[in-house]
Amino acid sequence: MAGYVQHGQTTTLEHAAAVAYLSLALVRKLGIRCNERALVRGALLHDYYLYDWHDHNAAPDAWHGFTHPRHALRNAEADFPDLTPLERDIIAHHMFPLVPSPPRHVEALVVSLVDKACSTIEVFAQRPWVRTPEGGAAC
């Protein structure tokens, strides 16, 4: 995941880590009761599709925005056979409404919303999740 660019200059690994961190921070800040372990695992694996979606020769199809949750879920199931149904829901439905089936659990809804916020930040900010030498976030 570290070898693939997600949005702007952000790698897929940086993006997934940001979504996991901010999803957990959000549920704790708002006092949302949920399965935090599944929330973090699902967030870390939500874009586990393992290809460069910018390279049309590497991508399995031309509809990345619509199909990558399916590829991510397939890869996650192969590499992490202990995935729970909740973690599968997070991965499979994080692109709602592009994926027409809505999230079934609050954890999946949180990851879906935080993913969109992180993606927007990553498109418009250069390296937003990279720490500066002073120790602060770049944005």
Residues covered by each model-derived region:
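Metal-dependent phosphohydrolase cores
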Residues: 1-139
